[in-house]
């Protein structure tokens, strides 16, 4: 376990704005947990492996378990370095261990960047760094996920490599079973859907559509700002050439041009900083929120799968009971032609009927037990999903507030800087 000073943990990264300190339940007590992802670095791979990007993950917590059960201060910082695949494994383990929880999504693998060779570029790594920050912040805010032992192992670091090697194979088998279940029920629908879930789906669809529209608008804003920045850069170069031409003939005009060029340059730099914030952070927040909504829908689909399992068992049980009753009353067990053929072949129809009734009674008994279990599972998933949706709403509202505040702060900072710059230019030109 690496340690760092308290001051070092909060410097040098814009991602610090996305970090959070939440109280998490551990053994009946509540502990603070703050996670910061920063400093993406290209590193050389081991023998035979290519280079990769690692991310510094700094954790502050007063949970003694994170500090070897010694008395810990919240200012004591644990620092580890993890690559993207490590975070993917953490995500998959949480998903496997907590099937009823809404597991925050991860950034996409970005295959195109791998093919183009841009996965070590600043824009790609910084955007991914911010997205990983969003993921770990959501985990730290979740009352169940934040107390997971695997999260502690991931953040502390001493046992992570061993744990990763031991768990990978087992996890893949469990995920294959989940995929099979999902495919089997992909085109089935719940017959008796709770109206509350219908309302939740409608709200989430509307929110997702709104987020995607805002995302498209700000993508256009980024493109437009890039064009403006380029135009002002060209304007600055042209004015510099003009300044050189008049510097020998008119010192006053040359000085005025110099001041104006500085204003143009400051505007270009300021807009570039604002644009980088929108591109590297705000757009990532919007995209991650859309993916988070998708994770919530996935949890609701899993809840639906359990409900579908219960409804299908119920239908099967009803059919079995009906068939048994028909046999008892003498109307079941096959059609008229089949009965005549059995009679001609010398079958004892009464013995066959009793045998079918006995088998159906055994089936009904087994189905009744399975139906009770399926009902409990479906009800549990429904209750837990409602709790998860409530927590999702809390985290989502908190994120929107933080993200919009950051966007407002960056815009205010830009315009205050421009006001100060051009007031100086105006005074100098008078």
Curated annotation (Swiss-Prot):
InterPro entries in the record, alphabetically? AH/BAR_dom_sf, PX_dom, PX_dom_sf
Q: Which residues bind a 1,2-diacyl-sn-glycero-3-phospho-(1D-myo-inositol-3-phosphate)?
A: 83, 109, 128
Q: Show the disulfide pairing.
A: none
Q: Which residues does UniProt call coiled coil?
A: 351-414
Superkingdom of origin: Eukaryota
Q: Does the keyword Membrane apply?
A: yes
The way this protein sits in the membrane is described as: Peripheral membrane protein
- Provide ranges: composition bias, Polar residues: 1-18
Query: Which residues constitute the signal peptide according to the record?
Result: none
- Tagged with keyword rRNA-binding: no
Q: Which segments carry the region annotation Disordered?
A: 1-22
In this protein, which residues make up the domain named PX? 33-162
Where is this gene product found?
Cytoplasm, Cytosol; Preautophagosomal structure membrane; Endosome membrane
Question: Cross-referenced SUPFAM superfamilies, in alphabetical order?
Answer: BAR/IMD domain-like, PX domain
Q: What does this protein do?
A: Sorting nexin, involved in the separation or division of vacuoles throughout the entire life cycle of the cells. Involved in retrieval of late-Golgi SNAREs from post-Golgi endosomes to the trans-Golgi network, for cytoplasm to vacuole transport (Cvt), and autophagy of large cargos including mitophagy, pexophagy and glycophagy.
The family database entries (PANTHER family) matched by this protein are listed as: SORTING NEXIN-4 (PTHR45949:SF2)
Q: What is this protein called?
A: Sorting nexin-4
Q: Which organism is it from?
A: Candida glabrata (strain ATCC 2001 / BCRC 20586 / JCM 3761 / NBRC 0622 / NRRL Y-65 / CBS 138)
